[in-house]
Structure formats: structure tokens, C-alpha cells
Regions:
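Glycine-rich ATP-binding loops of the HATPase_c
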Residues: 258-266
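Conserved signal-transmission helix
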Residues: 1-34, 202, 211-226
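Detector for a conserved hydrophobic position within an alpha-helical segment of the HATPase_c
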Residues: 254-255
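Conserved DHp (HisKA) dimerization/phosphotransfer helix of two-component histidine kinases, i.e.
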Residues: 49-56, 69-125
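Histidine phosphotransfer helical core of two-component systems
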Residues: 11-27, 31-38, 42, 46-85
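Conserved micro-motifs of the catalytic ATP-binding
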Residues: 95-100, 137, 141-144, 238, ...
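Short alpha-helical Gxxx[C/S/T] motif in the catalytic ATP-binding
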Residues: 246, 250
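Glycine-rich/acidic phosphate-handling loop/turn and adjacent ATP-lid/helix
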Residues: 186-239
Length: 280
């Protein structure tokens, strides 16, 4: 079964047609339900087999000293780890297609969740800088699916860390900036990016976030040609070594949650910009 990724225009067209045609809506829902159920069963079976393979590998390694010093055996272990990780991320991608309840949460809640994730996964390898976030933005109520939003933000953090690691940084510094939209009422703009430590900060700061949203994402002046179209393709990521579906997970979650997002690039530093509707 192939993976199909809809663009925003395709998604909007289908949604509009479904709202006017109940038979079409029922038919699409029936096909989607059957496809999701089938893919879920197959995916779980493959994951179970991969987990069993990894367990067997670890058991053999623990009982044989010669195997642990064998280069080819160790390479096989790395491949098994990548396979298991890939299957886990594929499950997240499939899960991101589900509808989720939209609730009220604050930017402060989001920051706390990000900090917890960084502490548990990276153990001091990432420093989070939130000094540019004002009290007004921190306490603002965002109307979104906090559960799916956390998944999307984890993907962005992982991408930012790997991109920083590629530049041989000893420590990744993530910059979080937030402003109220100067153009649209009741909208919050949040940017996440990694600081380029060797040449100072190349991150988008609050005073130029709003301008970069409308300009830098265009293919003509973005350092990564065709970036916009690639966001709708499965397996695309800003980092070549990233395992799994990366930014496609973020794109799908934002699409279903009504969250706007763009990627901007400056001096090989990639910044992700989210736009949230505030709860009135």
C-alpha cells in the first residue's frame, strides 16, 4: 500500500466537495477507514517482527564476546536499530492522520512540554533559550490540539538537533521566539531554530519573524529550492540523516489542526515558524 500525501489545495478541494455531497463524504470515509485498519494491522505485525529480531540480536550479543567485537555484527545491530526506529516513526505518521480534540492551552504549557522532552531525550545536549518570549505571549491561550502539537514540536526539535550536530556543535542551542501577529488579530507567531554558535546567531528574531513568513519561504529567495513543494512529500526532512518521515508528520498535524507553518532558511540555519489562532 502506497503512502499518499495531499497538498493543502487538494485537501481543501476534497473537504469542500465532501461538505456539499454526503455520498462522496461517506464513500471517502469508508475507504479511509478500511485502508487505515489494514495498514494498522500490517504495521503492527512488522513492528512485532522487528522487535523480536532486535531482542534476539541483543541476546546473542550478550552471550558472545566475539560477536560484540565483530564489525559486521555491530553494523547489523545498527541497521536493526534504524529499522525499529523507522517503523516507530511510520506509526506516528499514520497516527497523525487521526482527528484530535482541539482544546485551549498556553504557550507556557508548550514550553514546559518541550523542556521535559529535551531533558528526557538529550540529557544536556540541548539548551533552550526562551528569553525573547514576553509574558503576554507566554500566557496567551492557543486553540489547538496540544497532544498532536507536542508530537509536531518533537519532530522539529529532533531536526534542529541533527542539523546542529552536522555543523559539529558541541551543544545545540534552540531559540524560541514569539510575537503577536502585527497583521492578523488574535494570532500568535512562534519560531523555533538552532543557533549557529560559530558565527553568532543566525536565527530569526521577533522583529523580523513577520516579514520572513511572507518572503523567505518563497522558492525564489530561499536557500533550499523547491522546499515548499517538498513539504508535501513523505520522507522529506531538512537533514539527510533523519530517520523516518520527519517534516511530513509536522505538515499533516498542522493541516488537520488548523495551524499555519513555514520553514525559512538563512546561512544554512533552518527556522520553523508556526502561527496559532488565539482563543477569543
Amino acid at each position: 500500500m502506497g503512502i499518499v500525501m495531499l497538498t493543502f489545495n487538494e485537501y481543501t478541494t476534497i473537504s469542500n466537495n465532501c461538505s456539499d455531497n454526503k455520498q462522496l463524504s461517506d464513500a471517502i470515509n469508508s475507504v479511509c477507514s478500511a485502508a487505515l485498519e489494514e495498514s494498522s494491522v500490517i504495521s503492527h505485525e512488522i513492528k512485532n517482527q522487528a522487535a523480536y529480531l532486535k531482542t534476539c540480536y541483543q541476546l546473542l550479543s550478550s552471550r558472545n564476546d566475539e560477536l560484540r567485537s565483530n564489525k559486521f555484527w555491530n553494523n547489523m545491530g545498527s541497521t536493526i536499530d534504524e529499522l525499529v526506529n523507522y517503523l516507530e516513526r511510520t506509526s506516528i505518521y499514520r497516527y497523525s492522520f487521526k482527528q484530535s480534540e482541539t482544546v485551549s492551552c498556553t504557550l507556557s504549557d508548550i514550553i514546559n512540554n518541550i523542556n521535559e522532552y529535551i531533558k528526557s531525550r538529550y540529557n544536556g545536549l540541548i539548551a533552550l533559550d526562551t528569553s525573547d518570549i514576553s509574558l503576554e505571549c507566554s500566557s496567551a491561550s492557543i486553540y489547538a490540539s496540544s497532544h498532536f502539537l507536542n508530537i509536531a514540536l518533537k519532530e522539529i526539535i529532533d531536526n534542529a538537533y541533527e542539523a546542529a550536530s552536522e555543523r559539529n556543535c558541541n551543544k545545540c542551542i534552540l531559540i524560541l521566539s514569539a510575537i503577536m501577529s502585527p497583521d492578523i488579530k488574535d494570532q500568535l507567531i512562534l519560531s523555533i531554530g538552532s543557533k549557529k554558535t560559530n558565527n553568532g546567531s543566525s536565527i530569526y528574531q521577533p522583529d523580523n519573524i513577520s516579514s520572513c513568513i511572507n518572503n523567505d519561504i518563497n522558492d525564489n529567495n530561499c536557500n533550499r529550492p523547491g522546499l515548499k513543494s517538498k513539504l508535501c512529500k513523505p520522507f522529506y526532512t531538512t537533514h539527510k540523516g533523519h530517520t523516518g518521515l520527519g517534516l511530513s508528520i509536522v505538515n499533516q498535524i498542522c493541516l488537520l489542526s488548523g495551524i499555519g507553518w513555514n520553514i525559512v532558511s538563512d546561512n544554512d540555519v533552518v527556522t520553523t515558524v508556526f502561527t496559532f489562532n488565539l482563543q477569543s
